[in-house]
Swiss-Prot record:
Record's compositionally biased regions (Basic residues): 440-450, 458-502
Biased composition (Pro residues): 1178-1203
Chain positions covered by the region annotation Disordered: 171-197, 210-259, 389-547, 570-591, 950-981, 1058-1203
UniProt key word Secreted: no
Protein name: Uncharacterized protein CG7065
Compositionally biased tracts (Low complexity): 1118-1127
Chain positions found as Phosphothreonine: T970
Modified residues (Phosphotyrosine): Y549
GO molecular function annotation: transcription coactivator activity
Lineage of the organism: Eukaryota, Metazoa, Ecdysozoa, Arthropoda, Hexapoda
Amino acid sequence: MSFLPGEPVPPGFEEDVSRTAVIQKQIESYTAGPLIGTEYTIELHEPAQLRPNYFCVLCQTCSDGRNVFVHWTSQAHRTKYLQTHFQKAYKELQKLKRTPNSSGDLVTATGNLVKCIEKHFGRSRNLITATGDDFRRYRSKMCSQVRDSFHFDECAGSDFSEEAQRVIRELKPDESIKSSMKKNVDGTGDSNKQHDDGNIIALDAISSDDESFGGSTASVVPVPKGRQKNNLSEDAGGRSKNQSPPPAGGVNKTQHLPTPKELAIQASKISQERYKWEKFRCMLEIQLKQLRSDTEMYESNPEKHPDYPDEWKQFWNRRYKQLQEEKKCDPNQYDYKPEWISYWKDRRIVLFDIAVNKIKKDLKEKFKLGDEDEEKTLELMERYKIRVASPRRAPATTNSDNCRKTKPNFRNNRPIVATSKLPDAVIDISDDDVDSPPSRSRHSHKRRSISRSLSPKRGGRRAVRRSRSRSPRRSYNRGSTRSRSRSMRHRSRSPAHYRGRGRGREPASKERGSSSRDFGGRHSLQRERERSSEYYHRNEGYARSSRGYESVETFRVLDSRVYPEYKVTKTSSISPTASSNKEKEKEASEPIEEGPLTVVSVLRMLSAVEEHLGSLGPKALNLLSKALAMELVKPNAAEDLLRNEDNCVFLETTKEKLKGILIAEVLDDPQKVRVIKKLITNIAEIIYQATFKGTNDAVDVKVKANANPAPIQLPFDRNLVAPKLANALVLNGYNNVSTGDMNNLLHMLTLLMKTDKQRRQLDNNNGLKFEEIKVKLGLQNNPSPDDMGIDLDELMKEVEHQLHKESVDIVNKPTGAPAKVQAADTVGGSTGLESLTDSDLQTLLQNFKFLSNEEQVHLIGHLRKLEVQDPSRVDRLRKYVNLVELRGDGESCSDFLARVVKIGGASKAKPATKFKASVMGGRTSSAMAASSASATAPKVGHSMLSAQRPNLDRDMSSMPINKQRRGRNTPSIMLDDDDEEDDDYNFDDLVMKACDSNGSASAGGGGGVVGAGVHNKPGVPPIIGVESSPNALTFKPAAATKISLKDTENIIANLMGTLSKNGTSGGSPVGGNRNYMMNQQHGAPNAQNAPNLGQNPGQNLGQKQPGAGYSNAGYPGQQQQQQQQQQHGRNFGQEAQPLMSGLSGGPNANHYPNQQGYGGYHPFAGNGVQQNYGGMVPPGPGGYVGPPPNPWASNVPPQPPFNQMPQNFMGAQQQQQQQQPHFNNMFGGRH
């Protein structure tokens, strides 16, 4: 596509503008000869050359601008083009090679033929331009583009075979052509006048239009010259005695009967004519169908129309000139697109009509048909008939008055026919023509006599039907026998025809009277019958109109009546009801395909209608390939594709698109409609099957998943607590703790963090709130006001029970889950919770303690129902229940919640006894003095605990939680699964031994333990210990090193005090790691006094060292609180402290001689430096002003002090009293 400079590009071709060829103008102005195949040339531009090169793709040769025209006019280029696109004409030209000295003639003939082609098609101007580099890089692509472009071809028009023959004849006919011309010359007379061409043997030799019919067929039916002379003499001099008188118009020439071969030739000619028209209609319908589809494409993409650029150019030039003449606006700034769109819509219709006419014209030229849109079969029938006895056909020029004057005398009618000058004679071998003698008219009386000479031998059979008295001078000459035998042969070939014609005969007088009048009407009617589909079933009328030809229909070689119809049958003539009934009958008659409905079968049917799916077609094929690949791996594995939600959405989308196709009625083929309907049904069915199967499979999968539960997950991240635990161990001198001991301690600490309101509502009278552990570890900023404490022993026993139940459930998993699912329908009742989702139930379970009693009861009932209906769902919800690891795994979720509610009610209804509270309070606070008590304190505490143990056990056994667990005798389950070795000491023993070993120290410090518990705040549950039991919590330390009970006690006690932090501390793992590193750096000077694992840390920690103790690490400004403790006898150094004594808030400030205001966390022990972020008091003797960064705090200005101690210690009269410094050896000296 090339445009002149300044000429705009058609809309849609802005990015498709190619460079105009330099040689284009020279091609248009070249007149030295015809040019063909120029579109095969590519113009190549090199950067260093002024003139481009030209590469011919057809010949694979390269030339420059000076000799490219020589190449285009060469014999090789032209021959190659003809051989590629005009093969028929090329074969005709190759005949010249067989004759000697024909090389020059072949070149001339080729030039003349190329000239004809160029005159017909025009000169091609589509040259492609490219740079040399692009051509060398994309040579194959460009060559393919050139070959696939439009070329003049015999398929697009005439094949030029006739032109090639004409060129050869005009140039130099060869000897074979001359000999064939000589064979066509007739030796009897003047018949050579009608053969002007000489090389075509025409069938006109048997035509009755030529008066020398006998001469042209002398070779077929030889007649002696004497015979001809006798006939001429008889015709000229008079009539024989057996003949009727000659017509008055003149002398008739002799005619002979056609042979079967001649009749077969004329039948073949007619059949070929019909075949040509049938093929013409077929080809026309095919090409028009393609043209219609292209036109539909051009409606949406007009720029793809081949005439679009040229039409735009013409439109623009014409409109541009009009705007210039109008001078109303600037033509260069004018918007031509709106006018062009409307113009192109009309122009496209015109171009379609032009294309249709061109297709018709080309097909008629190809099949050598006439310009009329009708067959010439009837004309051929009239042309190739030899009329002898048939009166049916009379020319339209016959006088109607003479035809109506029919007389019985045969001779009276002869002048009428003689004056009409009929051009053909018809051979009538029928017996029925004798019934109409008045209307018979003949050229030759001899032929009439020959026809009537059959009557004497048939007299016995035909005497009833015709009279023999019409011609008294009948004679039997030599031709009668031959005529009769030939007539009998013709009659015997189609007996059915005569029977049909005899049945369909009308009265002779009526038909003869209307023959001349209705000739034109019957002729037009005959054409309509020829085109109609019912014509061949009603050929009796044709038999009545032309009897003389019907006898030779058995010689028809190519009969179009037995050919299949190429064009699509039109349904417009059929009523919609009839068509719909036929479709229903077809659907009912077709067998329905039986077989299992699978994903592969549905996708296979989808691939069959891929062309109607549009962009969804490739996706369907891709899914089919995946399904087949999965089927190869495992049978029926393709069904798993429907478990993917994206695949189900794709199938739903495909189904809706197919429904849209049916609704829009864009499909004409009823078979495709049935396929799409079936597809829609199958897609819906497999999606339903997948959904139904997915629900059943989900239950089975959940039941199987419960057989292998996930390992126990800790409630908090290990990285959150591990650095703080390691820091506490290092500060206390335990540098060689094994990995197993670390894991055991870490697991125990994290389990302690999991608390719940209902599980901790045991006793609110005494003890320390267990929620403070979260606060001190940085896991919770502020404790909830309504949180209650929890009994430590009950906590541990619940952990043991829960772990044991989990292991038992893993070993003995019930297999009755399907039965429970089936029995779900039998569970009645509804509380309105059936519509809740898993997310709603999760929220309710996590906030179970905030629900009212009625809501809790309803939720428990609903969970009981779910345990029967859907056990897997309840197991999935178990992880959302708080303290899920503190209950038995064999115990259902609803039973656990019910027990929690029962325990809470029992705790509220019956509080603990005062004696029990005092014991718990004493044991809870006794951990504070575990490392600083005197030698007499353990004996007092041990004797007190031993005296009170029976009562304590009796009271604990009467509690609801112990009543429920009394009958359970389950072995202890190891918390840590990493170590394979185990030890048999448990947490109960650890607590009891801590009380036995450290109780005397606290007793010696001051005060009785029993009396101290009277002043505790009621409602706070104490932390107590019980005897060792088989269900005790078991640890598994490393085999190499073992920690003694007292070491473990001191580690945990020191940890709880060391991990205390400011109110603003975030408790992040980063701070813990930083603290751990700092202690590692400063631990070397203190390592000399570090105790080993087998030594009691209290022995070394009992020595006083000035400035070596830690201040209160968790609660700034608590000096007043610590002063209150001495007045009430509740100093933490006066009681036997259990393991968790560090939770009380740190060491007593009165134990230190150089007590300063609380300043935060010491960088290292023993330096006497304390940073006071609150009051900024002067530093100690060995300190300095200027606080370093605190690794445990957030290093922001401190918040107001937070008082965590019980309120009954805050007496105003006791805040001014101070106690002598006392060293608390719990934190130890300088290590």
